[in-house]
């Protein structure tokens, strides 16, 4: 039986179309009311998009809550692995939107992890030139990162998330009780993004995780610490997004670990590593690059590595050719005027964005990672 807890509200204070991130156990049963509270009219048509592993335990609760609030609801269940994160799957969502007679006043609800959220958000952004979307993340990674901030998109054979749009949600609802059925590997993958926030600016969060004997499972963290992690991580993401909605400057720091991480995902093949696992490897890699450049201490790099390992995440760089890595890096979305930008750690709780990393430094870093 899910324990109902009070809802915690975090405001994403955008200049246009601000919205709330609502967190609390039993939140899924209150989704319909929360949408009404967010100003959505009760007679709207809603298409809920989910995947089998989520729709089975949580689909009925979601649909019942929406119908009780007066919404007309249809459910679409799709496969949602990284291999399915394609324009073809988005077209499947569009087909369902057509069948459900979604209008410009209608909404889509993404019930699932980051892949469901990314694809549903992109489908909403492109249906009838844009309809509203509500994000209901059910994985740790989606709760603390992917569902907040409006980044949507799908993969291209040449790289991850190369096709996409910024499309902010009307509401984000996080029900931590859905983590109870999340596979342990998926939970660990989400911890990579939590650790990332510690490096980016929350030193106390990093140290709290270091002091935890087992940060790799909900039980190891404990309910109180897990609730705190969700709230602090979501608040950190909300602050950055509010300050820089479309990644003109500050928001780029959220890509810490992602530059090398996307290389790992792309070259190893989508699905070999979960996104959070690849980010963990990428964090270790860029940490090594920062040590090589003299901007980060070896002690801090080892603290990061130990915490990532204690969360049950991989740290070893895969066997990839240097040429393939360099080619993949040049296709990264963060390239500006032909210069690749890295989010580089300078301490536990501080980073900087650098665009002066040379080809030789990257090659030296890759050699170090092999050892």
UniProtKB/Swiss-Prot annotation:
Binds 1 divalent metal cation per subunit. Can use either Co(2+) or Zn(2+). Pathway: Metabolic intermediate biosynthesis; chorismate biosynthesis; chorismate from D-erythrose 4-phosphate and phosphoenolpyruvate: step 2/7. Keywords: Amino-acid biosynthesis, Aromatic amino acid biosynthesis, Cobalt, Cytoplasm, Lyase, Metal-binding, NAD, Nucleotide-binding, Zinc. The keyword Amino-acid biosynthesis applies. GO terms for molecular function: 3-dehydroquinate synthase activity; metal ion binding; nucleotide binding. Zn(2+) binds at residues 193, 258, 275. Transmembrane segments: none annotated. Pfam families: DHQ_synthase, DHQS_C. GO terms for biological process: amino acid biosynthetic process; aromatic amino acid family biosynthetic process; chorismate biosynthetic process. It catalyses: 7-phospho-2-dehydro-3-deoxy-D-arabino-heptonate = 3-dehydroquinate + phosphate. InterPro entries: Dehydroquinate_synthase, DHQ_synth_AroB, DHQ_synth_fam, DHQS/DOIS_N, DHQS_C. One of its GO terms (cellular component) is cytoplasm. Catalyzes the conversion of 3-deoxy-D-arabino-heptulosonate 7-phosphate (DAHP) to dehydroquinate (DHQ). This is 3-dehydroquinate synthase.
């Amino acid at each position: 039986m899910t324990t109902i807890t009070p809802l915690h509200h975090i405001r994403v204070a955008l200049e246009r179309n601000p919205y709330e991130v609502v967190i609390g156990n039993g939140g899924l049963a209150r989704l319909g009311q929360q949408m009404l509270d967010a100003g959505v009219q009760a007679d709207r048509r809603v298409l809920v998009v989910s995947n089998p592993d989520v729709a089975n335990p949580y689909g009925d609760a979601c649909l019942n809550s929406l119908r009780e609030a007066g919404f007309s609801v249809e459910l679409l269940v799709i496969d949602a692995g990284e291999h399915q994160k394609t324009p073809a799957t988005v077209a499947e969502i569009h087909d369902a939107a057509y069948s459900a007679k979604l209008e410009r006043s209608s909404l889509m609800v993404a019930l699932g992890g980051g892949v469901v959220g990314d694809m549903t958000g992109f489908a909403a952004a492109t249906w009838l030139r844009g309809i509203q979307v509500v994000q209901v993340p059910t994985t740790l990674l989606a709760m603390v990162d992917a569902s907040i901030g409006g980044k949507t998109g799908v993969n291209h054979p040449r790289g991850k998330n190369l096709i996409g749009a910024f499309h902010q949600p009307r509401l984000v609802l996080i029900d931590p009780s859905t983590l109870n059925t999340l596979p342990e590997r998926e939970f660990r993958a989400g911890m990579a993004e939590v650790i990332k926030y510690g490096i980016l600016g929350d030193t106390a969060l990093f140290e709290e995780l270091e002091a935890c004997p087992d940060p790799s499972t909900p039980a190891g963290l404990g309910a109180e610490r897990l609730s705190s992690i969700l709230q602090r991580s979501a608040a950190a993401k909300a602050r950055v997004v509010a300050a820089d909605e479309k990644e003109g400057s500050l928001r780029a720091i959220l890509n810490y670990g992602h530059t090398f991480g996307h290389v790992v995902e792309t070259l190893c093949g989508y699905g070999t590593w979960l996104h959070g696992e690849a980010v963990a490897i990428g964090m270790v890699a860029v940490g090594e690059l920062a040590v090589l450049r003299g901007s980060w201490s070896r002690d801090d790099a080892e603290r990061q590595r130990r915490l990532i390992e204690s969360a049950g995440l991989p740290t070893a760089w895969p066997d990839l050719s240097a040429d393939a890595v360099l080619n993949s890096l040049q296709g990264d979305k963060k390239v500006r005027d032909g210069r690749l930008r890295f989010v580089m750690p300078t301490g536990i709780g501080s980073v900087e964005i650098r665009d002066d990393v040379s080809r030789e430094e990257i090659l030296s870093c890759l050699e170090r990672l092999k050892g």
